[in-house]
Amino acid sequence: MNCLSRTILFSGLISAFSLGQISPTQVGAANRQPPNVVVIFIDDMGYADIGPFGAKAYPTPHLDRMAREGRKFTDFYVTQAVCSASRAGLLTGCYNVRVGIFGALGPGARHGINASEMTLAEICKQKDYATAIYGKWHLGHHKQFLPMQHGFDDYFG
């Protein structure tokens, strides 16, 4: 997938969030703010493991409220069923093999996400969004592969 296709894909994603957040009375508002976008990406989670998708065993009130007040997507696909590869797919919009991530990257891995790959965070930065990632990165452990080199303003993980 080339950069233009990825830009269109991610612009469409942002637009989908935006359209769901605008009421008819807001359409003409001159000071309309872009929507907040939160992507939650969890390894090995079942469909009904959180409240918005039916979990009853434990409360998830903040996730429930986010789902109620925003957009909730119900169909999910990953490029591969391991952490590093599926993260690479989500962040680049490309198949993991296309971007050189063939499986899970352990602490001894010498490679990671290539600097030439455009990420979702970099596209969001072009639209003046602040970006952050919290939790497991798993796309390379050397400085050139870390989140701050790929469009994220803040990282803890």
Predicted regions and their residues:
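Formylglycine-dependent sulfatase
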Residues: 2-4, 8-157
